[in-house]
Amino acid sequence: TDSVRDYFLAEVWINNKWDWPGKNWSMWKVQNTDSSNEYADGKWRFMFYDIEFGGVSGEGDAWTNTMKEDNYKPKGLLDTDTKNPAVLSFAYLMSNEDFRNDFNDRLLKMSEGTFEKEKALDRLAEFESIYSPLYEQFFARYPDTGSAEEALHGGYASSDCIRAFINKRDKSIQSIVDWTNSQF
């Protein structure tokens, strides 16, 4: 259950929507267990990939209730009638009060820990310093796809959009928790 919880916590906090959770989710496990490795116990675990939609729409998406508005169903990620096995697993776990309380507490705390604003902004600046020098080369190779200036300061998916999302997302998390609790 920890894998499900932690995976959905991150996906919800970053508001990775559009093509998740309908697709772009996967699970893994080892075939041969190894007692010296806590992740080599043979249990299935969710894994992240293709999360590029998280936070890229900027400030407006910071206010999205990802629990409610994902999965294209009236109850979003809490829909127990879905055919999506990832969402179905999560929805049933959320029907357990202890799991739900733990999930909600951890979601609120992510704004103070893993996704604390200054830490996330510092990480974004670190990525900008690594990748910005490559932008001119990239856009020269792929003309008519944008520019270095747009990648940093343009609209959708620019660094500025991600920065705006990071600056506001923590303020919306309580409303996500409140909505989630109102469903039970």
Language model region names:
Residues 1-22, 26-184:
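Middle-to-C-terminal accessory/interaction subdomains
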